[in-house]
């Protein structure tokens, strides 16, 4: 039988952790001065007015490089718990992790051959 009262501490923590940011934003909205005018709507960068246009178009190579970085960053997140419990999990999990890394290496070789890792 599922007893809900076993999770009272969890639900209390969840409610308090949700209410604190809501209350902080609500109180700051009540106490903050309201200023309207052209200065409120002006754009600035690091405290000064921007020079030239604010919109820049990035080359697609930056996006590809960032995408490859995110893929291998997520790989690290998945492999870290596996490495910490390597001695407990056994051979089958080692084979699964090896297949996972192999798939990512194939993706890395593909990205390398397509030129996604080159800056020129």
Swiss-Prot record:
<keyword id="KW-0618">Plastoquinone</keyword>
<feature type="transmembrane region" description="Helical">
    <location>
        <begin position="88"/>
        <end position="108"/>
    </location>
</feature>
<feature type="transmembrane region" description="Helical">
    <location>
        <begin position="64"/>
        <end position="84"/>
    </location>
</feature>
<dbReference type="GO" id="GO:0009535">
    <property type="term" value="C:chloroplast thylakoid membrane"/>
</dbReference>
<keyword id="KW-0874">Quinone</keyword>
<dbReference type="Pfam" id="PF00507">
    <property type="entry name" value="Oxidored_q4"/>
</dbReference>
<dbReference type="GO" id="GO:0008137">
    <property type="term" value="F:NADH dehydrogenase (ubiquinone) activity"/>
</dbReference>
<dbReference type="InterPro" id="IPR038430">
    <property type="entry name" value="NDAH_ubi_oxred_su3_sf"/>
</dbReference>
<keyword id="KW-0812">Transmembrane</keyword>
<comment type="subunit">
    <text>NDH is composed of at least 16 different subunits, 5 of which are encoded in the nucleus.</text>
</comment>
<dbReference type="GO" id="GO:0048038">
    <property type="term" value="F:quinone binding"/>
</dbReference>
<keyword id="KW-0521">NADP</keyword>
<dbReference type="InterPro" id="IPR023043">
    <property type="entry name" value="NAD(P)H_OxRDtase_bac/plastid"/>
</dbReference>
<comment type="function">
    <text>NDH shuttles electrons from NAD(P)H:plastoquinone, via FMN and iron-sulfur (Fe-S) centers, to quinones in the photosynthetic chain and possibly in a chloroplast respiratory chain. The immediate electron acceptor for the enzyme in this species is believed to be plastoquinone. Couples the redox reaction to proton translocation, and thus conserves the redox energy in a proton gradient.</text>
</comment>
<keyword id="KW-0472">Membrane</keyword>
<keyword id="KW-1278">Translocase</keyword>
<keyword id="KW-0793">Thylakoid</keyword>
<protein>
    <recommendedName>
        <fullName>NAD(P)H-quinone oxidoreductase subunit 3, chloroplastic</fullName>
        <ecNumber>7.1.1.-</ecNumber>
    </recommendedName>
</protein>
<keyword id="KW-0520">NAD</keyword>
<dbReference type="GO" id="GO:0030964">
    <property type="term" value="C:NADH dehydrogenase complex"/>
</dbReference>
<keyword id="KW-1133">Transmembrane helix</keyword>
<feature type="transmembrane region" description="Helical">
    <location>
        <begin position="9"/>
        <end position="29"/>
    </location>
</feature>
<keyword id="KW-0813">Transport</keyword>
<comment type="similarity">
    <text>Belongs to the complex I subunit 3 family.</text>
</comment>
<keyword id="KW-0934">Plastid</keyword>
<dbReference type="GO" id="GO:0019684">
    <property type="term" value="P:photosynthesis, light reaction"/>
</dbReference>
<keyword id="KW-0150">Chloroplast</keyword>
<dbReference type="InterPro" id="IPR000440">
    <property type="entry name" value="NADH_UbQ/plastoQ_OxRdtase_su3"/>
</dbReference>
């Amino acid at each position: 039988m599922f007893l809900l009262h076993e999770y009272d501490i969890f639900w209390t923590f969840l409610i308090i952790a949700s209410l604190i940011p809501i209350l902080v934003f609500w109180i700051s909205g009540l106490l903050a001065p309201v200023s309207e005018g052209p200065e409120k709507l002006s754009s600035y960068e690091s405290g000064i007015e921007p020079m030239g246009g604010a919109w820049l178009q990035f080359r697609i190579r930056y996006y590809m490089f960032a995408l490859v970085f995110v893929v291998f960053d997520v790989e690290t997140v998945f492999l870290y718990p596996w490495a910490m419990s390597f001695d407990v999990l056994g051979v089958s999990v080692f084979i699964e992790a090896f297949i996972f890394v192999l798939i990512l290496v194939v993706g890395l070789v593909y990205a390398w051959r397509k030129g996604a890792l080159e800056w020129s």
